[in-house]
């Protein structure tokens, strides 16, 4: 195999691996590139390698995606193989038969590979919106903010982080595993989200026992119920956060106003220096960020856009327009 062909196959394998483990939509996979590779004599070897990096991946074997997702993926993989004149691959059909005998669950798993070789695995609802909340799944801005954090660990290392609207927990778990914060406070307000969030924290090897990290090198991790409309200044002050983050929480006008209210309280209640604040959001319409910026300006909170980062670790929609704003809160009690 020519060097460029080997490089292309490696890139293709990585794309299939990352997308499958994260259970991304099947149309987003590089099927056309696979079709071209299957014309080569080594096409069957590539398919077997894809099988090992997806359905047979150790992470997937332990915490796989939904049964329906795995079935559809294997069916499409088999169809691509059958479209070329070559011998059948028993391994593909055996894998499909095994999946067909597996019972479906209301929960599925998505896993995201980190540069260290570690991974973050989330248990998520098989429905996009369930129990009346959008917090049970991972949205693209959470992935984008996690990538930025991994590329800029100094912003989080040995610091206390408060995350507003943690949802399924992807961003925080990635930061805890890759950036070594002193402490990390996940927060949300919906009971179903908090239940799943606690489960995901435990699933990834962290302890929720106060002051009892799993080992000497672990961060102290807590999960807090935080209603933005009811939280008090004293509650926020008790967290003593050095950094505050939020991702994909600007999905309606009311939430935007509530978030700015919390940010103003954080600005007013700090005993010493105000925390660094990073808010990531996907621009779904012209109004998505416009209202937030208008409210920040009205509240006197300075903001600046963080330059786009270069490393793309996680599979999310290429066309997604995602922004990270760094907010500067001026502590009234600063030194």
From Swiss-Prot:
Listed InterPro entries: FAM86_N, Methyltransf_16, SAM-dependent_MTases_sf
Listed EC numbers: 2.1.1.-
GO cellular component: cytoplasm
Catalytic activity: L-lysyl-[protein] + 3 S-adenosyl-L-methionine = N(6),N(6),N(6)-trimethyl-L-lysyl-[protein] + 3 S-adenosyl-L-homocysteine + 3 H(+)
Main subcellular location: cytoplasm
Family recorded in the similarity comment: Belongs to the class I-like SAM-binding methyltransferase superfamily. EEF2KMT family.
Cell location: Cytoplasm
Function: Catalyzes the trimethylation of eukaryotic elongation factor 2 (EEF2) on 'Lys-525'.
Assembly with partners or alone: Interacts with FAM86B2 and FAM86C1P.
Protein name, UniProt field: Protein-lysine N-methyltransferase EEF2KMT
The entry's keywords: Acetylation, Cytoplasm, Methyltransferase, S-adenosyl-L-methionine, Transferase
Annotated residues for binding of S-adenosyl-L-methionine: 139, 165-167, 228, 247
Broad class of enzyme this protein falls into: transferase
Entry GO MF terms: protein-lysine N-methyltransferase activity
Modified residues annotated as N-acetylmethionine in this record: 1
């Amino acid at each position: 195999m020519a060097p460029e062909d080997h490089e292309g196959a490696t890139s293709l394998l990585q794309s299939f691996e990352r997308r499958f483990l994260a259970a991304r939509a099947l149309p987003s996979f590089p099927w056309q590139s696979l079709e071209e590779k299957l014309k080569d004599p080594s096409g069957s070897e590539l398919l077997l390698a894809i099988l090992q990096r997806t359905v047979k991946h150790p992470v997937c074997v332990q915490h796989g995606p939904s049964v329906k997702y795995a079935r559809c993926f294997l069916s499409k993989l088999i169809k691509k193989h059958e479209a070329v004149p070559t011998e059948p691959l028993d391994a593909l059909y055996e894998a499909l038969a095994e999946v067909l005998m597996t019972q479906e669950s209301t929960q599925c798993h998505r896993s995201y590979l980190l540069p260290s070789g570690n991974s973050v695995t989330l248990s998520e609802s098989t429905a996009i919106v369930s129990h009346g909340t959008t917090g049970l799944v991972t949205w693209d801005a959470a992935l984008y903010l996690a990538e930025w954090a991994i590329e800029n660990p100094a912003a989080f290392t040995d610091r206390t982080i408060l995350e507003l609207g943690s949802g399924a927990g992807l961003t925080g778990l990635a930061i805890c595993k890759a950036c070594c914060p002193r402490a990390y406070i996940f927060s949300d307000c919906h009971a179903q989200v908090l239940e799943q969030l606690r489960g995901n924290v435990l699933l990834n090897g962290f302890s929720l026992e106060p002051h009892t990290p799993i080992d000497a090198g672990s961060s102290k991790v807590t999960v807090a119920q935080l209603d933005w409309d009811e939280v008090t200044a004293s509650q926020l002050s008790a967290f003593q956060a050095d950094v505050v983050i939020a991702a994909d929480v600007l999905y309606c006008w009311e939430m935007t106003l509530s978030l700015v209210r919390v940010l103003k309280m954080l600005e007013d209640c700090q005993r010493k220096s105000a925390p660094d604040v990073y808010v990531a959001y996907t621009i779904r319409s012209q109004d998505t960020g416009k209202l937030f910026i208008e409210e920040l300006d009205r509240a006197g909170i300075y903001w600046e856009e963080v330059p786009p980062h270069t490393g793309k670790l996680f599979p999310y929609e290429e066309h997604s327009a995602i922004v990270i704003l760094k907010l500067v809160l001026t502590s009234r009690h600063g030194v």
